[in-house]
Design a protein with these regions (language model features):
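Beta1/beta-strand and adjacent pyrophosphate-binding region of the FAD-binding site
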Residues: 1-9
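Conserved N-terminal/central alpha/beta ligand/cofactor-binding core
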Residues: 15-119, 134, 146-166, 170-175, ...
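Local beta-strand N-terminus motif with an aromatic residue
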Residues: 110, 127, 140-141
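A short, glycine/Asx- and small/polar-enriched loop/turn
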Residues: 122-128
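Core beta-strand elements of the Rossmann-like FAD/NAD(P) dinucleotide-binding domain
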Residues: 133-142
Length: 214
Protein backbone atom coordinates (compact mmCIF):
# COMPACT_ATOMS: atom_id res chain seq x y z
CA UNK A 1 0.00 0.00 0.00
CA UNK A 2 1.25 3.49 -0.87
CA UNK A 3 -0.13 6.42 1.13
CA UNK A 4 0.44 9.88 -0.36
CA UNK A 5 0.51 12.47 2.41
CA UNK A 6 1.34 12.36 6.12
CA UNK A 7 -1.25 14.54 7.83
CA UNK A 8 -4.08 13.30 10.05
CA UNK A 9 -5.68 11.14 7.34
CA UNK A 10 -2.39 9.84 5.94
CA UNK A 11 -1.17 8.76 9.37
CA UNK A 12 -4.38 6.91 10.21
CA UNK A 13 -4.51 5.22 6.78
CA UNK A 14 -0.85 4.16 7.01
CA UNK A 15 -1.10 2.81 10.54
CA UNK A 16 -4.39 1.00 9.87
CA UNK A 17 -3.00 -0.77 6.80
CA UNK A 18 0.31 -1.60 8.50
CA UNK A 19 -1.42 -3.01 11.58
CA UNK A 20 -3.56 -5.21 9.33
CA UNK A 21 -0.37 -6.79 7.97
CA UNK A 22 0.18 -4.79 4.78
CA UNK A 23 3.58 -3.46 3.76
CA UNK A 24 3.02 0.30 3.68
CA UNK A 25 5.01 3.15 2.12
CA UNK A 26 4.12 6.62 3.38
CA UNK A 27 5.28 9.40 1.05
CA UNK A 28 5.55 12.96 2.37
CA UNK A 29 6.99 16.09 0.79
CA UNK A 30 8.74 16.75 4.11
CA UNK A 31 9.22 13.97 6.67
CA UNK A 32 9.84 16.58 9.38
CA UNK A 33 6.23 17.79 9.13
CA UNK A 34 4.50 14.43 9.66
CA UNK A 35 1.42 15.07 11.81
CA UNK A 36 1.91 18.83 11.79
CA UNK A 37 -1.06 20.81 13.12
CA UNK A 38 -0.94 23.71 10.69
CA UNK A 39 -3.40 26.26 12.07
CA UNK A 40 -5.72 25.21 14.86
CA UNK A 41 -4.16 22.85 17.44
CA UNK A 42 -7.55 21.25 18.12
CA UNK A 43 -8.80 17.69 17.74
CA UNK A 44 -12.57 17.35 17.53
CA UNK A 45 -15.01 20.22 17.86
CA UNK A 46 -18.36 20.97 16.22
CA UNK A 47 -19.12 18.54 13.36
CA UNK A 48 -15.74 16.86 13.96
CA UNK A 49 -15.75 15.43 17.49
CA UNK A 50 -17.87 12.43 16.50
CA UNK A 51 -15.40 11.59 13.71
CA UNK A 52 -12.45 11.73 16.11
CA UNK A 53 -14.30 9.33 18.42
CA UNK A 54 -15.14 6.96 15.56
CA UNK A 55 -11.45 6.85 14.59
CA UNK A 56 -10.60 6.11 18.22
CA UNK A 57 -13.22 3.34 18.41
CA UNK A 58 -11.70 1.71 15.32
CA UNK A 59 -8.23 1.63 16.90
CA UNK A 60 -6.83 4.83 15.41
CA UNK A 61 -3.97 6.83 16.89
CA UNK A 62 -5.46 10.33 16.95
CA UNK A 63 -7.32 9.97 20.25
CA UNK A 64 -4.38 8.33 22.04
CA UNK A 65 -1.98 11.04 20.87
CA UNK A 66 -4.47 13.72 21.94
CA UNK A 67 -4.69 12.18 25.43
CA UNK A 68 -0.89 12.33 25.68
CA UNK A 69 -0.45 15.89 24.36
CA UNK A 70 -3.72 17.64 25.24
CA UNK A 71 -3.69 20.96 27.09
CA UNK A 72 -7.42 21.53 27.51
CA UNK A 73 -10.47 19.28 27.08
CA UNK A 74 -14.04 20.61 26.79
CA UNK A 75 -17.47 19.47 25.65
CA UNK A 76 -18.85 22.16 23.34
CA UNK A 77 -22.50 23.09 22.73
CA UNK A 78 -23.65 21.93 26.18
CA UNK A 79 -26.29 24.68 26.29
CA UNK A 80 -28.12 22.69 23.62
CA UNK A 81 -29.33 19.09 23.54
CA UNK A 82 -26.95 16.11 23.91
CA UNK A 83 -27.34 15.26 20.21
CA UNK A 84 -25.20 18.27 19.25
CA UNK A 85 -22.59 18.12 22.03
CA UNK A 86 -19.08 17.98 20.62
CA UNK A 87 -15.85 16.97 22.40
CA UNK A 88 -12.81 19.12 21.64
CA UNK A 89 -9.22 19.01 22.85
CA UNK A 90 -6.59 21.71 22.43
CA UNK A 91 -3.17 20.09 22.02
CA UNK A 92 0.45 21.11 22.30
CA UNK A 93 1.13 21.45 18.55
CA UNK A 94 4.75 20.36 18.57
CA UNK A 95 4.28 17.57 21.12
CA UNK A 96 1.43 16.13 19.02
CA UNK A 97 3.50 16.34 15.83
CA UNK A 98 6.62 14.78 17.35
CA UNK A 99 4.67 11.96 19.00
CA UNK A 100 2.82 11.10 15.78
CA UNK A 101 6.10 11.01 13.87
CA UNK A 102 7.61 8.75 16.55
CA UNK A 103 4.61 6.38 16.38
CA UNK A 104 4.92 6.12 12.59
CA UNK A 105 8.68 5.56 12.69
CA UNK A 106 8.40 2.62 15.08
CA UNK A 107 5.54 0.84 13.25
CA UNK A 108 7.05 -2.46 11.92
CA UNK A 109 5.28 -2.62 8.52
CA UNK A 110 5.50 1.11 7.77
CA UNK A 111 8.28 2.75 5.73
CA UNK A 112 8.50 6.54 5.51
CA UNK A 113 10.02 8.18 2.43
CA UNK A 114 10.42 11.83 1.47
CA UNK A 115 9.21 12.82 -1.97
CA UNK A 116 6.51 14.81 -3.74
CA UNK A 117 4.23 12.58 -5.80
CA UNK A 118 3.63 14.19 -9.19
CA UNK A 119 2.00 11.40 -11.16
CA UNK A 120 -0.28 8.39 -10.79
CA UNK A 121 0.88 5.30 -12.67
CA UNK A 122 -2.14 3.57 -14.14
CA UNK A 123 -3.27 1.43 -17.06
CA UNK A 124 -6.67 0.12 -18.10
CA UNK A 125 -8.37 2.20 -15.39
CA UNK A 126 -6.29 0.57 -12.65
CA UNK A 127 -3.70 2.38 -10.52
CA UNK A 128 -0.48 0.45 -9.92
CA UNK A 129 1.88 3.03 -8.46
CA UNK A 130 3.12 6.62 -8.30
CA UNK A 131 5.99 8.69 -9.64
CA UNK A 132 7.70 11.49 -7.70
CA UNK A 133 8.89 14.86 -8.97
CA UNK A 134 12.43 13.38 -8.99
CA UNK A 135 11.32 10.64 -11.40
CA UNK A 136 11.38 7.81 -8.83
CA UNK A 137 8.65 5.22 -9.35
CA UNK A 138 6.99 3.18 -6.59
CA UNK A 139 4.60 0.32 -7.30
CA UNK A 140 1.77 -1.08 -5.17
CA UNK A 141 -1.59 -2.80 -5.46
CA UNK A 142 -3.29 0.07 -3.62
CA UNK A 143 -2.65 3.84 -3.59
CA UNK A 144 -4.35 6.03 -0.97
CA UNK A 145 -4.31 9.80 -1.60
CA UNK A 146 -4.48 11.93 1.57
CA UNK A 147 -3.11 15.24 0.31
CA UNK A 148 -5.27 17.59 2.38
CA UNK A 149 -4.97 21.19 1.19
CA UNK A 150 -2.07 20.55 -1.18
CA UNK A 151 -3.85 19.61 -4.45
CA UNK A 152 -3.78 22.82 -6.52
CA UNK A 153 -3.38 24.60 -3.19
CA UNK A 154 -3.95 28.36 -3.21
CA UNK A 155 -3.32 30.59 -0.20
CA UNK A 156 -4.97 33.98 0.37
CA UNK A 157 -3.39 36.63 2.62
CA UNK A 158 -5.47 39.79 2.46
CA UNK A 159 -5.79 40.64 -1.24
CA UNK A 160 -2.69 38.63 -2.18
CA UNK A 161 -2.75 35.07 -3.51
CA UNK A 162 0.02 32.53 -3.95
CA UNK A 163 0.23 28.83 -4.70
CA UNK A 164 1.00 26.61 -1.73
CA UNK A 165 -0.26 23.69 0.31
CA UNK A 166 0.29 25.60 3.54
CA UNK A 167 2.66 28.35 4.67
CA UNK A 168 6.20 27.58 3.53
CA UNK A 169 5.30 24.49 1.46
CA UNK A 170 4.58 24.12 -2.26
CA UNK A 171 1.26 22.97 -3.71
CA UNK A 172 0.93 19.54 -5.36
CA UNK A 173 0.17 20.80 -8.86
CA UNK A 174 1.66 17.81 -10.69
CA UNK A 175 -0.54 15.27 -8.94
CA UNK A 176 -3.61 17.45 -9.54
CA UNK A 177 -2.96 17.37 -13.28
CA UNK A 178 -2.36 13.63 -13.22
CA UNK A 179 -5.71 13.03 -11.50
CA UNK A 180 -7.47 15.14 -14.12
CA UNK A 181 -5.76 13.23 -16.92
CA UNK A 182 -7.07 10.03 -15.34
CA UNK A 183 -10.60 11.38 -15.74
CA UNK A 184 -11.25 12.52 -12.18
CA UNK A 185 -13.03 15.80 -11.55
CA UNK A 186 -11.42 18.22 -9.09
CA UNK A 187 -13.28 20.75 -6.96
CA UNK A 188 -12.18 23.37 -4.47
CA UNK A 189 -13.05 24.05 -0.85
CA UNK A 190 -11.87 27.07 1.13
CA UNK A 191 -11.05 27.48 4.78
CA UNK A 192 -10.10 30.64 6.62
CA UNK A 193 -7.77 31.30 9.55
CA UNK A 194 -8.50 34.47 11.57
CA UNK A 195 -5.67 36.90 12.32
CA UNK A 196 -3.67 36.10 15.44
CA UNK A 197 -3.57 38.64 18.26
CA UNK A 198 -0.40 40.13 19.72
CA UNK A 199 -0.41 39.08 23.39
CA UNK A 200 1.18 42.25 24.73
CA UNK A 201 -1.57 44.33 23.08
CA UNK A 202 -4.26 42.69 25.28
CA UNK A 203 -5.15 43.67 28.85
CA UNK A 204 -5.34 40.14 30.27
CA UNK A 205 -6.74 41.41 33.58
CA UNK A 206 -10.03 42.15 31.82
CA UNK A 207 -10.43 38.59 30.54
CA UNK A 208 -12.26 35.64 32.09
CA UNK A 209 -10.45 32.32 32.25
CA UNK A 210 -12.22 29.44 30.54
CA UNK A 211 -10.93 26.30 32.28
CA UNK A 212 -11.00 22.84 30.77
CA UNK A 213 -13.21 20.01 31.96
CA UNK A 214 -12.24 16.72 33.57
Amino acid sequence: VIVVGAGHAGIEASLAAARMGCEVLMLSTNVDTIGQMSCNPAIGGLAKGHLAREIDALGGEMGKCTDMTGLQFRMLNKRKGPAVWAPRAQCDKKAYQFRMKWICEREPNLTIQQGQVSKLLHAERKVHGVETAMGVEYFAKTVVITTGTFLRGLMHVGDAQQKGGRSGEAAATGLSGSLQEAGLELGRLKTGTPPRLLKRSIDLSQLEEQPGED
